[in-house]
């Protein structure tokens, strides 16, 4: 269409772009565009998730400003390696001339120059020789060699400018969470691998000289601007010799300053690493943070991040042994620093928080005996299968209190799912939250982006605020989710309908946290100086860590409760690979529930399974179920036997399994089991992804379940293989998921004949 020309107060010709009555932008004659509204990242996710987007325009396009008095000043929920944007990480990689592995060059299909291809081929041959007798073979050997073959990242970009635009675009995409639809924790774990190349980068031994003319040819203006500033920093004596990590923290502060954020608490697992890494980080913090505060005005504090479960990508490194024991010993060491203000249990919420009660007890004791102002934070209420984790978190802390000990400073991250807040249990929870002065942290974008929330009407923040509960906003990592703090606050305002009074309440909590933190820092700084007593930081903390490890070894108790059995031992006779010559049909309904919830099989649902068994060819398809032998999954096994069918039925089971589930699998007519890399049962959806959705076409029939089956469905939608997904909308817990995937998943009711539709859509199983 045509935009009418207007004259503004300065007698300039301008063009006003409006859509749906909302002013989008002012366009000036010289081509400058002044944006007045935006589509937040969270809305873009919801739009890409469905083929039938139906949010109204006022909840899609939002004014891009907030009243100054209501603008949040803190980010109290974020993670160290999730904070920086892709552009900052790429610029840091160029400045630092990091090693960029061949594995990622291949994985992202990046383009090298002919000279670079020849050089890296020579290097790879040398590396291959080193692993000749490693015992590895096939894909594992290839991966090992490619992981240890590198190109200088600066060389890759500056001496390959003809491909720079293409390569930077691909690398950018790899450094933030999936944008075209909701992601799941599998995507998060993969993303961390790509970000670690930059966040934990290793500088090349031999650096190249950068021609100034080539700097001007960086095809992305934002990256060029960042890189030029980073090179100017080298002229500053205070910044000339800082480490990559210190550089990273400096840029975190600079990015926060742009957003008017002046206080943040960052969770970092490096602060829990024994024998040097944690102490090294503290030493670096004590050098760089005073400078950062002086330059930016941003105060950065840290929380020791303790993994509730290890990340899948690094599980083999730390799963063995009582890893939380070592983490807690290190925590008690680094917590001497005034920059370390608390702890944070992080990671995917797929286990009952009471599993962590021994570790929580030890933290509560530490607060009582050593540091009464130390914060205990727990990620809880992110998973609808564990709705009691918020109340259980509080209970674990209360039951750990020593006689006469007041409730510590407690914050709960997410708080999205709890008991119904209008029920007696929910009202009891609200009273406890208020009485114990507990702060809830909300991150709406990460909730939606990580498939924990599909229906925005279910978000409880407004109810908490109305009940007088202290609430704050966090980001969960701006760079990770491609957002900023303003984007988050706009989403709260326009999608969750928080008003100015709500924001005033949240700002008041922020002010309280910052005020307490400032006093805490002042006191703790004096205590730290006394503790050092003339020693340097490394010397003093190394001595203390050694003492803490000795004391820790005297405590033989496991810090995480686990009564399950090793699946490989109890089901060894059942372990086998999934077939590759047939189409897998996944039946979900029984293994994917919250604890204590049982799936009831309806007569209509049973009839659908009978029809499916009758019409599908056993030579062309097989069934895959979960580990519980309950509900529709158990029903397909029994019907296969009763109807004298000969379908192969396999189960994907967790790495650790209960005695009951193990016995049930052995008693049923299960042809084989595939053992997941995940120890917790709610994480087995990841193995459905690795074993099926990323490798082959499949059919998914989701009858019932909570968050785990929602993740299973999302994995099927996101996978490289083509999955036909059928979702039972009679199940209340699946209804919202079916709606959000409108056009990508086919909803069905158990009293309808969906089987003919399945056969029609999937002729290869006939």
What are these regions (language model features)?
Residues 550-750, 756:
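Acidic/glycine-enriched connector segments
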Residues 18-20, 31-34, 38-555:
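Metal-cofactor-binding active-site regions of metalloenzymes
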Residues 751-765:
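A charged, well-structured terminal subsegment
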